[in-house]
Amino acid sequence: MSEVTLLVRDKEVVIPGQPLARGKVKPGKDVYVDESGTIRSKKLGLVSLKDDEISIVPLVGAYIPKEDDLVIGIVSKISGNTILVDIRSPYQGALPIQRRAERVDLKKYDLKIGDVILAKVRSFDGASSLILTIDAEGLGKLEGGYLLEVDPAKVPRVIGKRQSMLSMLKEATRSEIIVANNGRIWVKPPSVKELIVLEKALKKIEEESHVSGLSDRISSLLSQELSR
């Protein structure tokens, strides 16, 4: 048998049927070998290369970053001039500390582990290099509030056409709400009652996003729950 020929990189996102490798490599989970001896992916997922084995980690419901995406992250580590951020993705975000950049509010980078931030994806190479930025106005540390989550694929339904659903949630619960592309939602309601109602509304949106008349059902839920 021939030597190994890798056609993908470790942690690269692949689609079903995509060729992964040929030669002396062991097929692992969620891959198959075609008639020509090429190992291919069975699912949408991340390539995992370990020793002489290649497998796929499925990405059902996972957030795959795109340039200019708005994300809500949690500071997980501070190493030298880089702040590492969990963005609810197989990829960890890196926030370079701009110590000498002009027109940058350096106080924004005064962060600690556990802080919640609103950031934008500045660049992503599709494999391992995911760079975030908080330099623009409105980005940076989120003070107080609560973090809720939905499937990233449901984010457009939470926002609605021309932000109609998001506006309804804000107005009905009198809450500050920020919805990010990675499915994290930061809310700052006036009381725990509104928080609970928002959780119920988001769950309903997530479960019934495929059914018509969703806005009317959410409006009814908000009215009923908030009038109690």
Swiss-Prot record:
Q: Which GO terms describe its biological process?
A: CUT catabolic process; exonucleolytic trimming to generate mature 3'-end of 5.8S rRNA from tricistronic rRNA transcript (SSU-rRNA, 5.8S rRNA, LSU-rRNA); poly(A)-dependent snoRNA 3'-end processing; RNA catabolic process; U4 snRNA 3'-end processing
InterPro entries (alphabetical): Exosome_RNA_bind1/RRP40/RRP4, KH_dom_type_1, KH_dom_type_1_sf, NA-bd_OB-fold, Rrp4, S1_domain
One Pfam family this sequence matches? KH_6
| Gene (UniProt) | rrp4
Q: What is this protein called?
A: Exosome complex component Rrp4
User: Which species expresses this protein natively?
Assistant: Korarchaeum cryptofilum (strain OPF8)
> What top-level branch of life does the organism fall under?
Archaea
Q: Which NCBIfam families match?
A: PRK04163.1-1
* A molecular function (GO) term: poly(A) binding
**Is Cytoplasm tagged as a keyword?**
yes
Primary location: cytoplasm
Location comes to: Cytoplasm
Q: Name one GO cellular component term.
A: exosome (RNase complex)
**Hey, which family's this protein in?**
Belongs to the RRP4 family.
Q: Which UniProt keywords apply?
A: Cytoplasm, Exosome, RNA-binding
Outline the subunit composition.
Answer: Component of the archaeal exosome complex. Forms a trimer of Rrp4 and/or Csl4 subunits. The trimer associates with a hexameric ring-like arrangement composed of 3 Rrp41-Rrp42 heterodimers.
Where do the S1 motif domain residues begin and end?
Answer: 68-135
Q: What does this protein do?
A: Non-catalytic component of the exosome, which is a complex involved in RNA degradation. Increases the RNA binding and the efficiency of RNA degradation. Confers strong poly(A) specificity to the exosome.
Q: Which HAMAP family match?
A: Exosome_Rrp4 (MF_00623)
